[in-house]
Design a protein with these regions (language model features):
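Gram-negative bacterial Sec-dependent N-terminal signal peptides
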Residues: 2-21
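A short helix->beta-strand "capping" segment at the edge of beta-propeller domains
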Residues: 23-36, 195-199
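Beta-strand-rich domains and repeat architectures in extracellular enzymes and scaffolds
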Residues: 30-71
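Blade-terminus and WD-like Trp-Asp/Gly-His loop motifs, strongest in beta-propeller folds
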Residues: 42-49, 94-103, 140-149, 209-217, ...
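A flexible loop/linker signature enriched in serine peptidases of the S9 family
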Residues: 54-72, 86-92, 107-118, 132-138, ...
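Short loop/turn segments that connect beta-strands within beta-propeller blades
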Residues: 77-80, 121-125, 188-192, 241-245, ...
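Extracellular/periplasmic ectodomains of large secreted or surface enzymes and adhesion receptors
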Residues: 186-187, 288-310
């Protein structure tokens, strides 16, 4: 009696193993055409929902026209409880929630339009355009903490004369003489799209920006030009006063500049940077006080390496 139970269990395990082996098969090109991966993920402020995208290529094995990766917006409410939140032909990026959690926002280009910031209510309804920059695509964006403003990083303004030359056949690029600088804008969020978003003057080429949790400041990564040398060695953090739209401080770092984070109270910046111009990688943690030298951008503040305790 005691021997029968182990034998029965062994027989069941062997049967299950044989069944699994029978179902297993080599991966085929058709399988590759049907692969999907999770793209961006955003959690609602109250933690009740997760917005995410699934990235996939057209399934040419089923007759779909070949094309680029499509990102489908989905909303999850719990385990095994998720659904598509936009039509299949709307491929989005930059997914996040509005500060009050009532809307999922994303970037998308509608037909022949430039990429803009759109939103769709989480409780149902159609998507609508929230903010845009005329004649330029929005590359990234961020909400103000109170949800009243959207800050946008957009492409360079179109050079009509250069566009005319390109259409006539002159499409050469003059190295280091045709830098296309990104631009920073703020747009009011309301029932209608802000027709005249405000431009914020930032010197050089802006590559990234973050809004402080208190909504008073933003930190902007900017280099003199888009050239790779400047991106490596001359990029600096600019502290922006969101009320006046002016740069109040430039934080000097001695070498390469990596990730920048703002403290929860908005008082300090933490930065991964090099220790000097000869440091081949940004691997040292630096701290800088946001309030230091505030209002005097002509006297840049210095970021100090953070002393770490020995283990």
């Amino acid at each position: 009696m005691t021997l029968r139970a182990p034998l029965t269990a062994a027989a069941l395990l062997a049967t299950a193993s044989f069944a699994a082996q029978a179902q297993a098969r080599p991966m085929t090109p058709e399988d590759v055409a049907q692969l999907e991966s999770v793209g961006t993920i955003a959690v609602s402020p109250d933690g009740s929902r997760i917005a995410y995208t699934t990235a996939s290529l057209p399934d040419v094995t089923e007759g779909e026209e070949n094309g680029t990766t499509q990102q489908q917006l989905k909303l999850a409410y719990g385990p095994s409880n998720a659904r598509d939140f936009l039509p299949d032909d709307i491929s989005v990026s930059g997914v996040t929630f509005s500060p009050d959690g009532r809307m999922v926002s994303f970037t998308w280009a509608d037909e022949d339009e430039k990429t803009a910031v759109w939103g769709i209510p989480v409780d149902g309804g159609a998507q609508r355009k929230l903010a845009a920059v005329e004649g330029a695509a929005v590359r990234s964006y961020a909400w103000s903490p109170d949800g009243s403003t959207i800050w946008m990083l957009a492409g360079a303004e179109e050079d009509e004369a250069r566009t005319k030359q390109a259409k006539a056949g002159f499409n050469s690029v003059v190295y280091e003489e045709e830098a296309k600088l990104t631009r920073l804008f703020s747009a009011r969020v309301g029932a209608e799209t802000d027709a005249e978003p405000k431009a914020v003057a930032i010197p050089g080429y802006v590559s990234a920006f973050k809004v402080a949790p208190d909504g008073r400041h933003a930190v902007v990564d900017s280099a003199p030009t888009p050239q790779i040398d400047d991106a490596y060695t001359a990029k600096r953090a600019h502290v922006l006063d969101l009320t006046s739209g002016k740069v109040v401080r430039i934080v000097e770092t001695p070498g390469k500049l990596g990730d920048i984070e703002i403290s929860p109270d908005g008082a300090q910046l933490s930065m991964i940077a090099g220790v000097d111009m000869n440091d081949p990688a940004a691997t040292t943690l630096h701290l800088a006080d946001v309030a230091e030298a505030e209002g005097d951008a002509e006297a840049p503040g210095q970021a100090l390496p953070l002393p770490l305790a020995d283990p």
